[in-house]
Each structure stands twice: as C-alpha cells, then as structure tokens.
C-alpha cells in the first residue's frame, strides 16, 4: 500500500524537518517487508483567502485534486478519534489487507479542514486534546508511521 502525506503549509529547514525526514527514512527502509511504501509528501501553500471558511475550502480543493482515485483518506483533525499506536498500526494493516492501493493522510492548515474534507475522510484521527504546531504534528505523524512498521515487524522500538 502506497502512503502519501498531504500537508497544508511548508516545513522550514531546521531540526523539525530533519526529524520528519529521519522518521520517513526509517519507515522507508523497513516498511516494504510489511507491504507498506512511502509514496510522497505533498506540501501546498496555505490559502491567502480572507476568511477561515474560504481558506479551508481552497485548501480542501487542493487536497481533492491531489487525491489518487480510488484512495483511502485519513484526516488529522481535532474532532477525530484519539487511538493508541497499536490501534493505528491495526488500522493501516486493515487497509493494506483490504487491498487498498493508495492511502493519503492529510494535515490541515492553521484553520483545520473544511466540512467537505471531514465528510470525505474514511477516518478522522486526533493527536489528542492538545493543540500542536504544524511542524510537531508532522513529526508525530511520521513517528507513528515508523512505529507502525516496528509494531508489524515485532521490533523492540515499540515496547509491548
């Protein structure tokens, strides 16, 4: 299963970007053994529209244009479900075993996602009740992708 990340906003060069790349590199090196592959990180600029609703709609349109068809969509959203690392790994394994070819995980901009994006989501994922800066949300997501592979491979990185 090909996994892509769609992110509104661009990472600045620095420690956060290095950490995201490190986790994606670790993921890519060991994910093939469990039928997962990292396809791409697609970054789009934040909308400059005047209202939050307009910005979310514009960013949502960019997401829909980028979605391969057919694909599954996980949307990172504060209204989503907070799950354990094992439950997240099981969700990805379920999609893979179901024969899903493309999975896109979407990180929204400062305003979040539009209602249309949330409605299209196959799963709404929350990183908990706290608000996270965009760079840290990317780190959390990429670390969990790597952790998913370590869980599937029974690697000691994830302590059971």
Curated annotation (Swiss-Prot):
Pfam families associated with the record: SPOUT_MTase
Enzymatic reactions: pseudouridine(1915) in 23S rRNA + S-adenosyl-L-methionine = N(3)-methylpseudouridine(1915) in 23S rRNA + S-adenosyl-L-homocysteine + H(+)
Enzyme class: transferase
Subcellular location: Cytoplasm
Ligand binding (S-adenosyl-L-methionine): 108, 127-132
Highest taxon in the source lineage: Bacteria
Family named by the database record: Belongs to the RNA methyltransferase RlmH family.
Descriptive protein name: Ribosomal RNA large subunit methyltransferase H
Gene that encodes the chain: rlmH
